[in-house]
UniProtKB/Swiss-Prot annotation:
Residues 79-82 are annotated as: Involved in Mg(2+) ion dislocation from EF-Tu. HAMAP family: EF_Ts (MF_00050). One of its GO terms (cellular component) is cytoplasm. Associates with the EF-Tu.GDP complex and induces the exchange of GDP to GTP. It remains bound to the aminoacyl-tRNA.EF-Tu.GTP complex up to the GTP hydrolysis stage on the ribosome. This is Elongation factor Ts. Belongs to the EF-Ts family. InterPro entries: EF-Ts_dimer_sf, Transl_elong_EFTs/EF1B, Transl_elong_EFTs/EF1B_dimer, Transl_elong_Ts_CS, UBA-like_sf. PANTHER family: ELONGATION FACTOR TS, ELONGATION FACTOR TS, MITOCHONDRIAL.
């Protein structure tokens, strides 16, 4: 299949490899970006792409807390200009507060909630859309419950483009907020390595076994090296094993232990996570308009 310049650029942005290497990998992978990344990693030319690296949509995230319940939401807009204005921020807070109040099951149920007599949450979103002139959508949310002995910690980064919500047991709200800051900044995927699904580990092992630097090595040596790399991989994606963002001399596990607590769960939202933004070629668009 024909490989486009846009595909090559996207792969280079994600892996930092050269243009020809990116194109060769895409050709070999039949244009499949994820497969191309794996092929480059097998050749030792690229690191693992982070799960949340496809960020494209605009908008903001927010966290609302009410007693033993908290909600984290993502509200999308078409441009960052609208995402930063007063009307959008007012809507963002209203949506978060409504969701934490009623704990709806899903987005559809949330949009049907009555925020005031005769007006649903969806009506309110449509009203703000009419004011701003841009389509605004509630993309997703999570509602988290805690016990009386537990504490919430939340942190918003880069003017709400990233938010994190953490539940700790035994530790203070301040400690929970510090861990939420770490989650927002470092983007772990799991609390601990025992939560990593077997298929994720199996895929990583497959990639490592195919690494060119293992060619010709005895099987027992190869197995030991792969085992070490898997251990490192698990530490990189597991919150408790990561160096703590506020003190790199200790892990998150050591920090929370020093606070006489434990991490129960976390949720991290980054605006546009997993959404591919449509890129328009200006010259092509003008040509179309001119017929």
């Amino acid at each position: 299949m024909a490989i486009t310049a846009a595909q090559v650029k996207e792969l280079r942005d994600k892996t930092s490899v050269g243009m020809m290497d990116a194109k060769k990998a895409l050709v070999e992978a039949d244009g499949d970006l994820d497969k191309a990344i794996d092929l480059l990693r097998e050749k030792g030319m690229a690191k693992a792409a982070k799960k949340g690296d496809r960020v494209a949509a605009e908008g903001m995230t927010a966290v609302a807390v009410k007693g033993n319940r908290a909600a984290i939401i993502e509200l999308n807009s078409e441009t960052d200009f609208v995402a930063g204005n007063a009307e959008f921020n007012e809507l963002l807070n209203a949506v978060a507060n409504t969701i934490v109040e009623f704990a709806p099951a899903d987005v559809e149920a949330a949009l049907a909630l009555e925020v005031q007599e005769g007006q649903t949450l969806n009506d309110k979103i449509i009203g703000t859309t009419q004011i701003t002139g841009e389509k605004i959508t509630l993309r997703r949310f999570s509602v988290v419950e805690k016990s009386d002995s537990e504490n919430f910690g939340s942190y918003s980064h880069l003017a709400g483009s990233i938010s994190a919500l953490v539940v700790v047991d035994g530790a203070s709200e301040e400690a929970a907020k510090d861990i939420a800051m770490h989650v927002a900044a470092i983007a772990p995927q799991f609390v601990s390595d025992d939560q990593v699904p077997a298929d994720v580990i199996a895929k990583e092992k497959e990639v490592q076994l195919a690494s060119e630097d293992l060619n010709g090595k005895p099987d027992n040596i190869k197995e030991r090296m792969v085992e070490g790399r898997i251990k490192k991989f698990l530490a990189e994606i597991s919150l408790l094993d990561q160096p703590f963002v506020k003190n790199g001399d200790q892990t998150v596990a050591q920090f929370i232990s020093s606070q006489n607590g434990s991490v129960k769960s976390f949720v991290r939202y980054q605006v546009g996570d997993g959404i591919e933004k449509q890129v328009t070629d200006l010259a092509e668009e003008v040509a179309k308009q001119l017929g």
